[in-house]
């Protein structure tokens, strides 16, 4: 005999649109612009949509007339970019809304109790990143070198903030705090060729 049974479930929806434009001139000057809009059901009305642009440019110095063609460096490109991204992961499907659960008993009466506090002000966590880099190809492209310096700023971090026990709830999801990351990346690749 089954005395009681329960089940839980949930779903969320994400809608995205994307536009990208690539431009170049004489294989020396390169430009890219993109923008995307994402709509998530995890957020309340008014905060569901986020817009995230990005732009990048590059200068292939090795294709300029003043650049020596018979040197060690066979390709040289300077590039820079800036872009914004959004995050909606790490939170529940309904954290912007109150959730209630039935089956609670008080003084012999069945009832419904709120189990999750609503936060209709929840919004996208956003990160913007700036990159400055240099690409080198040496010895007729046998050796390639890449160098990057980046700065990443994240704001409106999605975080479960603990609440005092007197509230009857353990936490509430909020946009709290910010974070900054900086770093330098360096990579070298060597293509070894042999002849018989």
Map each language-model feature to its residues.
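Extracellular/periplasmic, surface-exposed regions of secreted and cell-surface proteins
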Residues: 1-196
């Amino acid at each position: 005999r089954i005395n009681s049974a329960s089940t839980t479930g949930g779903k969320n929806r994400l809608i995205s649109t994307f536009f990208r434009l690539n431009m170049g001139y004489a294989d020396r000057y390169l430009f890219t612009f993109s923008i995307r809009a994402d709509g998530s059901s995890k957020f309340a009305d008014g905060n569901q949509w986020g817009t995230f642009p990005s732009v990048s440019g590059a200068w292939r110095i090795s294709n300029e007339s003043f650049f020596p063609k018979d040197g060690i460096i066979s390709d040289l490109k300077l590039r820079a970019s800036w872009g914004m991204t959004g995050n909606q992961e790490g939170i529940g499907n309904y954290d912007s809304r109150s959730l209630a659960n039935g089956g609670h008993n008080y003084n012999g009466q069945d009832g419904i109790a709120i189990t999750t506090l609503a936060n209709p002000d929840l919004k996208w966590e956003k990160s913007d990143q700036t990159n400055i880099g240099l690409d080198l190809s040496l010895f007729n492209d046998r050796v390639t070198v890449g160098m990057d310096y980046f700065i990443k700023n994240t704001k409106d971090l999605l975080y479960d903030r603990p609440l005092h026990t007197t509230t009857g709830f353990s936490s509430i999801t909020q946009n709290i705090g910010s974070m900054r990351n900086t770093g330098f990346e360096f990579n070298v690749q060597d293509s070894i060729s042999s002849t018989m």
